[in-house]
Amino acid sequence: MSVRILLVALLICLSHGSASCVGREVAVAVSESGDAFIVQATIRPPVSPRTAWEVLVDFDHMTGILSNLTASRVVSRNGNVLIVRQEGIARFGIFSYPFKAEREIRMEPQRRILAKNLSGTLKRMESEVRLIPSGVGGVRIEYRAEFAFDSIIAGLFGVSFLNHEVEEQFQSIVAEMKRREAQAASDPLQPNR
């Protein structure tokens, strides 16, 4: 590799901060496809697969994890299929986007979570979360979602808006995963909530 390429890479790293150059915990990409936005994210939390799973499916306590949620509860449970109702306000710059969602959640414990919007302020939303074993006792989370908005403003700023929201939400989720993992390590007899 030439010195010139190394210098350019170093300048990019310095201008974006060290997190861009050293294994980021949350990486998000958003693209447009017709009337929808496709979100893909890779999350590398430094926690066990079990802790990651417990946080991802803790819908009844999600308001304590995600600051943009004002309500989150499981309204129906049938084995590994849940109906979850959530409300909140997403903020992006000077804009805010109040939302409501009722979603069907299908879980394959410790492996996969499928979500589909049944009703709410989004025109359409479907997502898949996959937990993939990584390293010794670690986990990598792959997230893919498709969003279609009813709001013109949300649609206009969709790529930037979703990139901001998804990255912020997964950073909060990773912080909760770390908190619970540390709590479990310090006192294995206490529940992780």
PLM-predicted stretches and their roles:
Residues 5-16:
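Bacterial N-terminal signal peptides
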Residues 19-79:
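Hydrophobic ligand-binding cavity/cleft-lining segments
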Residues 117-164, 168:
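Beta-strand/loop substructures that line and gate deep hydrophobic ligand-binding cavities in soluble
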